[in-house]
Structures are given as C-alpha cells and as structure tokens.
Design a protein with these regions (language model features):
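Transmembrane helix-loop junctions in multi-pass membrane proteins
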Residues: 17-30, 99-101, 113, 171-187, ...
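Extracellular loop-to-transmembrane helix junctions
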Residues: 29-49, 107-138, 147, 190-202, ...
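Selective recognition of specific alpha-helical transmembrane segments in multi-pass small-molecule
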Residues: 43-52, 166, 171-173, 226-231, ...
Length: 639
C-alpha cells in the first residue's frame, strides 16, 4: 500500500509540473526552472519503474541464467566481465557526449517548450528502447556489432549497406564530438591540464583493480575520486604558471593530441584505460549535473526564453532551418541517438556480466542522459534571449535588436567571467556561462563566476571526450569486421597489427574532418548522421523482435523507426539544398567545393540509409505474412 501511495504521489507531481511547463496552469506567467527539473525527474523515475520492466520482461525476456559473451569469449582485451557499476559508468560516459550538452543549448533558439517535450518523450520512449534492444540483441549474438546483426537479420544487401553507412556515419559523428572538445579546450590550460591528468589516473585505477587489489571496486573508486578532485582543483593554478605553455594549446595542437589519445585508447586492453577512465569521468559527469540540479532547486531561476520563438517557422541565427526537422537532429543524443547503438553493440555487450543488468545499463543510462539534456536546456534558457543569441551567433547587437531580441547583459557577463563571450557560436561558451550563472548564484558562491566558467568548459570537454575514445574503438571493431571479408586475420581483434592499422585509419579520418571543418558544417551533418543511424538501429531492432516471435510488441521500435526516418530524410533533403545554396554564393572556389562535398556526404549517408530501410521493409512484410521461415540467430550460452 505504501509503495502504491508513493507512485501515485510521484505521478501527481509529474502531472502538475508538466501542466505548469506547458502553460496549462498560469499560462501568462514566466515559469520557474524548478518545474522542469521536477517534471523530468518524476517522469523518468516512472518510466524506469514501469516501461523498463515491461521491455525487459515482455519484449526481450531477459534471462539471468544465460552465460554472457564476456564470460564465454573472455580474452582480457575486448571481452572482459565487468562490475555492473563500472560498466554503467563506462556505458554512460561513452554515450553521453556533446549531444545532451550542445544540442539542447543550440535548440533553445526555438524556445524552451519544444526542446523540453522532445527530450522528455524522445528519451523515455525512444532512446531508452533503442539502446536496450540493441544491447540485448548484441549480447544474444556473441557481442556482434550492429552491422553484423543487420547482415544476419536483414540479409547481405542491407547488411553491407548498413556496415558502410555505420562506418561512414560514426566517422562524421566522431568529428562532430571531437570538434566540440576542441572548442571547449582551446586556449584553456586549466581544462586541458585536468583532462590530461585523468589519463594516468585511469591507468592507475585499471592496474589497481585488476592487478594490485582485484575486485576492490570501492577502494579503487575512492582513490580515483580523490585524485580526480585534485586534478580539477589543481588545474586552477595552471594559467599563468610555468606549465601554462604546455597546456595552453591551439585548436590544431588539440586535434593532434586528441587523435593520439583516441588511437592509444582504442588499442590498449579495455580494462586498462577505457573502462576506468569512463568510470572515473562518470563521477564528474553525474556529480556536476546533480550539483547543477541542486543549484536550480536552491536559486529557482526564471526561464527567460519564450515557450516558442518566431524562429520555429523559418529558422534563425543559430539553426538555419525550421523547428521540424532541425530541432530533432540538433538535440540528437539528448533524446535519441544512433551513436548509442554502436556502444550498445560495441564495447558494452563484451563486458556485461549478467543479462539482468541490461535494463539498468541500457535503459537507465539513457534516462540519466535525458536529464543531462534538460539541465543543459535550463542553462540556455535562463539567459536573457538577446544575450543568448549574442553569444551563439555572429549577428551584431543592432541586428539582434531589430529582430526583437535586444542584448542586455552581454558586457556584464563578459566582465564577470573575464572573457569576451560575444560572438562565440557552437554552444560550448553559452553553456559554460549558463552553468556558471547558476553555480555563482548559490549562497556563498558569489564572486566565483570566472572559476565556475572555466570549470564548466573543463566539464564539457571531459563529458565529450569519453565518447570519442569509445567511439574510436567501436569504429575499429567495424573496420576490422569489414576488412576481415577481404583478409581474414583483420577480423580477429586479438591480432595487434590489425588493431593498430584499423585504429590509425579511423583516427586519421575523423581528425581530418575536424581540421577541415567548422561547427556550422559538421554539427548539422553530425545530427543527420546520428539520427539516420538511430533509424537504422530501430529497423534492425524491429526485425529482431519480430523474428523472436514477439510481433505484437514490435511497435516499441517500429513507431520510433518510422518517425526517425521521416525526420532525418526530410532534414537530409533540406540540408543538401542549404549546402548547395551556400556553394552557389561562396566567395571562393575552395569554400564552394567544401559545401558541395558536404552536400554529397549527406546525400551518400541518406542513400545508404534508404537502401537499408527498403531491405528492412521487405523482410518485415515477408516475416509478418509468413512467406519466409523465421530463423533466430541467437547464440545459446546457458550456465
């Protein structure tokens, strides 16, 4: 009875909070950011309690008695049984990158309401299912990648198209994520020093847990957190010191440094660097977001951005397209992310100890990421709209005033953080300003705005970099799988020359895109690539569910698949037209060629995705109509 009463109370609280947010209650008043925090927290708790249980028990039929690939194929490099909390930390750190931070910040152009509703509904009913179903499918198939699962489930044509699409998409995605790290750390010695220090700390944690004190997770965690806090606070003393020149890096130097790190993390055994660093980063990620939520609760800031702005109809100074479809591809990982399917069928299934942990890791980590996206949206929308646009666009103050968004406090904000923040597009700077505004408003924190601003930039880089290292490793898996069709030893992950060669090719590809691109070209391509991949993953998940004899539950992936294909193909068409228009108006031959290449890349990604979609549709109707015998591809490992 007590439990039932608690869930009723949580449901009522969620309903009231959502009513305030959407304007049913007090529609004429500006709302308090506290309502967004409460609504999201309650909605996500309810979703995890009921929808996650439904997916695990009815749709997937989790079996905790089955032996997982991590145990059966243990090799100490990629396949390695891992504690559920450490694996949650790795998985969350790997999936939670630039999307939930930068995406909502940029999408705030359309107002706070569309983005908030999409983050809430998209993550709870779409993103969670996407991640959980693909993780389950991979665990049941020896930890196979999404490309291999697609080949097994939908056939060779769709499988090959999916493999090339996924490889191409992940390279573009890694470039987008890497660019966000570069923008956050450029000329920031504090952040660069702290990020660099997490690498030896993670190596020590890995050796401590698996060699010095095997299985002592609590000890390792305590030591790691203490060392991480030292790295964070000691970084404050780097600017202006004799170490400043070593960590005050240009963008090109940062690209090279990140590429070297990504290569090393991709080749080393997963337990040595990747897993402990991701686990360590998760403490900082979740801890900072938790403190940000506490700050919002304590100071209760008012949302300054209108519910819906005039840019919803025809685009604005930050995002050139209208709300549909560009809001959905801009928010990306904050609601639904195809990149997650690469982690859910890459590193995570090879480290899972027990199937019962699948909902906790796949479903739970996505909900936490959704909450991160809500906090990023709040950080954007508590800024005065004119100041928000002044930071995130290159428009003059006069031009912003002419379109109805006068700049009010931009000079004051620049003085408070000791940095000129005007005309700094990309989302990283405005997010840091928003976070610093919340932290410095907490009692006792006044006057620490510059500290919190630099801390926020470091936090963003730490948040995003963990997806770059894990993504590079996953891309290496995929490239080795494809290469193995030509030269068989390449497909063996234990073969070091293959690991090194594939990692080098992957790192070279995404680092080149960062060198040659910018946020205005890479981020829209990243959004389209990411969401096209999500649509493909939903399609593969639908076939997996149908072939498992659960046709009546196929709607959990089929409905999101249809929506994501409709959204991303529309966005692809509009983005191609946008790049073609920019090419026709380019001031130089080089710029025109760049925009034409961008248009071709989007067309190529969309074409591959359509091929996969057609193959999925054909297979789906054949299975449903009974024309083809259903053959399950699961590997039965029972303990």
């Amino acid at each position: 009875m007590l439990k039932k009463s608690i869930w009723i109370l949580v449901s009522v609280t969620a309903s009231i909070s959502l009513s305030v947010v959407v304007g049913i209650i007090n529609p004429s008043e500006k709302i308090n950011a506290l309502w967004l925090v409460v609504a999201a927290a309650c909605f996500y708790v309810i979703t995890y309690r009921f929808y996650a249980s439904f997916i695990a028990a009815k749709v997937l039929t989790i079996d905790e008695n089955r032996t997982t690939p991590a145990q059966k194929i243990f090799d100490g490099i990629d396949y390695h049984p891992t504690n559920r909390w450490i694996l949650f930390g790795h998985h969350f750190a790997a999936i939670a990158g630039a999307g939930p931070l930068i995406g909502p910040m940029l999408a705030a152009q359309f107002g706070y309401l569309p983005g908030f509703l999409w983050i809430l509904i998209g993550s709870a009913l779409g993103g969670t299912v996407h991640d959980t179903v693909i993780l389950f499918a991979s665990v049941r198939r020896n930890g196979k990648s999404l490309a291999q699962i697609a080949g097994d489930e939908i056939g060779p044509v769709g499988g090959i198209a999916a493999a090339f699409a996924i490889l191409f998409i992940i390279i573009v995605a890694l470039a987008g994520l890497g660019l966000a790290v570069v923008n956050a750390l450029s000329q920031s010695p504090w952040g660069t020093f702290t990020i660099a220090l997490t690498i030896p700390i993670a190596l020590f944690m890995g050796i401590y847990l698996y060699r010095i004190r095997p299985g002592k997770v609590a000890e390792m965690s305590a030591i790691g957190v203490i060392l991480l806090l030292f790295a964070v606070f000691s970084g404050h003393y780097i600017p202006g010191s004799f170490l400043d020149p070593f960590f005050n890096l240009s963008k090109n130097s940062l690209v090279l440094s990140i590429a070297i790190y990504g290569f090393i993390a991709s080749v080393l055994p997963v337990w040595l660097l990747l897993a402990p660093r991701d686990y360590l980063s998760t403490y900082m990620k979740i801890g900072t977001i938790f403190l940000l939520a506490v700050g919002v609760i304590m100071i209760a800031p008012t949302i300054q951005m209108p519910p819906v702005t005039r840019f919803a109809e025809g685009g604005g100074p930050i995002i050139p397209g209208r709300l549909f479809p560009f809001m959905f591809i801009t928010i990306a990982c904050g609601a639904i992310s195809g990149f997650h399917s690469l982690i859910s069928s890459g590193t995570t299934p090879k480290m899972l100890m027990n199937e019962r942990d699948i909902p906790f890791i796949g479903f739970g980590a996505m909900l936490v990421e959704g909450f991160v996206a809500v906090m990023a949206l709040i950080a954007a929308t508590i800024l005065i709209p004119g100041d928000y646009f002044a930071i995130n666009s290159k428009l003059s103050f006069e031009a912003l005033a002419a379109i109805g968004f006068p700049v009010e406090r931009i000079s004051e904000l620049s003085e408070m953080v000791k940095t000129d923040v005007a005309g700094r597009p990309g989302g990283a700077v405005s997010l840091a300003v928003g976070m610093a505004s919340i932290f410095s408003a907490i009692p006792g924190m006044k006057g620490l705005m510059p500290y919190w601003y630099n801390f926020a930039l470091m936090f963003e880089a730490l948040f995003i970099l963990t997806t770059v290292d894990a993504g590079t490793r996953v891309a290496r898996f995929l490239l080795q799988e494809l290469g193995g069709k030509v030269y068989k030893p390449l497909s063996q992950t234990r073969w070091l020359p293959g690991n090194i060669g594939a990692s080098l090719l992957v790192v070279s590809a995404w680092s080149y895109l960062i060198y040659s691109g910018n946020i205005s070209s890479i981020w829209p391509m990243f959004g389209v690539a990411n969401q096209l991949l999500a649509a493909v993953a939903f399609g593969v998940g639908t076939i997996v569910i149908v072939k498992s004899g659960k046709l009546k539950y196929a709607w959990v992936t089929f409905i999101p698949m249809v929506f994501m294909f409709a959204t991303t193909l529309t966005a692809s068409y509009q983005l191609i037209e946008l790049f073609r228009d920019k090419a026709s108006r380019a001031r130089s031959v080089t710029d025109a060629l760049t925009f034409k290449i961008d248009a071709f890349l989007v067309f190529f990604m969309a074409t591959l995705a359509v091929i996969v979609l057609i193959d999925i549709a054909v297979k789906f109707f054949r299975y449903v109509s009974g024309r083809v015998e259903v053959i399950r591809k699961e590997i039965d490992f029972r303990g």
